[in-house]
Amino acid sequence: MKPHLKQWRQRMLFGIFAWGLLFLLIFIYFTDSNPAEPVPSSLSFLETRRLLPVQGKQRAIMGAAHEPSPPGGLDARQALPRAHPAGSFHAGPGDLQKWAQSQDGFEHKEFFSSQVGRKSQSAFYPEDDDYFFAAGQPGWHSHTQGTLGFPSPGEPGPREGAFPAAQVQRRRVKKRHRRQRRSHVLEEGDDGDRLYSSMSRAFLYRLWKGNVSSKMLNPRLQKAMKDYLTANKHGVRFRGKREAGLSRAQLLCQLRSRARVRTLDGTEAPFSALGWRRLVPAVPLSQLHPRGLRSCAVVMSAGAILNSSLGEEIDSHDAVLRFNSAPTRGYEKDVGNKTTIRIINSQILTNPSHHFIDSSLYKDVILVAWDPAPYSANLNLWYKKPDYNLFTPYIQHRQRNPNQPFYILHPKFIWQLWDIIQENTKEKIQPNPPSSGFIGILIMMSMCREVHVYEYIPSVRQTELCHYHELYYDAACTLGAYHPLLYEKLLVQRLNMGTQGDLHRKGKVVLPGFQAVHCPAPSPVIPHS
C-alpha cells in the first residue's frame, strides 16, 4: 500500500510542477507584448464598417454603397463634438503655437507624431520617399484590422504545453522582430480591404503644396478609381487636351468664361411639354443677388471642422452655403448657424430618412438640387432614368412652397465643370460628376466677390470622419473614390489666395469671385484680305 501512495505523491508533485511551468511560460509570453500597443482584431475592412455604430439615417454620399444602420446606433451629436478619433490630426492651442513657430509646419516632426503615432495602429509603405499610414479604424481599436505583434487567424498561436527555454527565447526574439518589421512595412500580401488612414503627414503637406497624384493613394482607393474608369457609367467621351500648365490668372479666366451657372428653366424638352416653365422660379439663380455679395462662406461637412471654433467667423460672412443634411444645431461653435443656400443631391429628396418634406433644414433657404446625368446631357434620357428620381419631389415641393427659391442644376453645367477639371489635370480622372463641394464653390464664385471655403482642403485636424454630424469613417470622403475629389482639391489649391497659416490651421481657402477677376479681352479675329 505504501509504494502506491509514494507513486501517487510523486505524480501529484510532478503535475504541480508541470502546471507551474506552464503558467510561467504563459506569463512570460504575454508580458513580452507591448502593453502600450492597441490590441488589433482580425476583422476585415468591410466587417469593421458593418460593426461601426453608423447614425440611423442613410448617408448622403453620392455614388457610395449604402449599408443599413444597426439598431440602437449612437447619436452622432452625443458621440462626436468633443471626441478626437485616434489617427486624426487634432491640434490644440499648444500644438498651433508650435506649428506657428515652424515655417512650413514640418521642421518639428513631433508635431504630427504626437497626434498620430501613439493613437493609431499604423503600418507604412514607402512611395517617392514618403511614408503613408495603413492604420486601423480611428477611435475604434477593438475593431481594428492588423497583426501588430499578435498572431492572426492564419498563424498558429502558442501550443499548449511546456516549451524548452531556448525555444521560448527564440520565439520571443522572432516575435519582437516580426512586430517591429510589421509596424514599418506594409505586407505585400495584404488585400485591398485593409482600412487605411486617410493620409500621412507627408501626404497632407504635399496636398497643401499641390504636389500629389493618385499613385500616392492607398491601394484600396487606387482600385476604386480604376474600377470607376473602367465602368464609365455616365458614358464620358472626353475629347479635350489634358494639361496643367495654366497660371492662376489664366485658370480663373477659364472658369469665369466657361463655368456659368445654369439651371433647368423649363424651356427644353421634355420639361417644356410638362409645364415646367411655370413651375421653376421666375428669377434665375444667377440673378437672385444682382449686385453681388461681398463675402461668402462655403462650409464643408468634413469631420475635420469639429473643435475648430470657426462658427463666429463663418457667420460673419454675407452668405453661407451648406451641403445636404449638415445641421447647425448643436454645432454652432464650430460651423455657425447661418445658412443662405443649401446644395442637396438627389438622394436627399428621395430618401425618406432625410425628411425633406418637413425638416427645418430645408426651409427658409435657397435650395439647389442636382443629380448625375449622362455626359451627353441628354435631358430626355435623364428624365426617364435619373440616378435618383428627384423630379417628383421637386414638383411637389414647388407646388407647396412656390415662394421658396428652389432650382435643379442643368447637367451641362455639371459636366462643364468636369471638363475643366480634366483639362487641367494630366492624369485621367474618374468619369463621374464633381462633388457637391466643388459645385458649391463654383456657384458661390459666380455670386460673391470673395469666397472663403472651410475644410475642403483639410487642416491639421484632418480625420477620416466623413461628416461632422455622422459617425462614419472612410478615407474616400477626403480623397475621393466616386467623385474626382483629389483633382478638385488640387485645382482649388492652385486658385487659393489665402495664407498658408489659414490653410494649415483653419482648412480655409480664399478664392476671388468672378466679379473680381479681370480678364483680357479676346483678341479680335482679323480677316484675311
From Swiss-Prot:
Glycans are attached at S69, N211. InterPro entries: Glyco_hydro/deAcase_b/a-brl, Glyco_trans_29, GT29-like_sf. GO terms for cellular component: Golgi apparatus; Golgi cisterna membrane; Golgi membrane. The chain crosses the membrane at residues 12-32. Disulfide bonds join C253-C519, C296-C448, C466-C477. Weakly expressed in some tissues, such as small intestine, colon and fetal brain. It catalyses: a beta-D-galactoside + CMP-N-acetyl-beta-neuraminate = an N-acetyl-alpha-neuraminyl-(2->6)-beta-D-galactosyl derivative + CMP + H(+). GO terms for molecular function: beta-galactoside alpha-2,6-sialyltransferase activity. Transfers sialic acid from the donor of substrate CMP-sialic acid to galactose containing acceptor substrates. Has alpha-2,6-sialyltransferase activity toward oligosaccharides that have the Gal-beta-1,4-GlcNAc sequence at the non-reducing end of their carbohydrate groups, but it has weak or no activities toward glycoproteins and glycolipids. Belongs to the glycosyltransferase 29 family. PANTHER family: BETA-GALACTOSIDE ALPHA-2,6-SIALYLTRANSFERASE, BETA-GALACTOSIDE ALPHA-2,6-SIALYLTRANSFERASE 2. This is Beta-galactoside alpha-2,6-sialyltransferase 2. It comes from Homo sapiens (Human). The lineage of its organism: Eukaryota, Metazoa, Chordata, Craniata, Vertebrata.
